[in-house]
Amino acid sequence: MECNVPVYQLRSGISRQLTTFRPDTRQKTLRVEPHQRLTLVQTEETGMVTRLWLTFPGWFWQHWNPNAEIDATLLRCLILRIYFDGNPFPSVESPVGDFFGVGHCEYRQYLSRFLGMSSGGFY
């Protein structure tokens, strides 16, 4: 589809949610092994990202058990890379914790205009 209006100025369109949930297996999570790269979303369509929500079960769910040991390095070791418009280099390359404002890898619920962290994940 040819469009002469910048995507951020579009006021109408179709909203879509891309998710890791697989109806065939009813799995909600993806397992990422050390040094493994995983593509979460890849599309050729025109559009914009309005929300990115990530949850790490082994990290968030441990906070509900005050006696559990938490591996704080997880948020420093998982690297988020976001590529746009066929660019071979990422427009975003950051540890997940830094990207969502949790650079010290400590659980702190917060809400801001653009980012937040709750017991359910990062957004």
Predicted regions span which residues?
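Beta-strand-centric surfaces of beta-sandwich/beta-rich domains
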Residues: 1-123
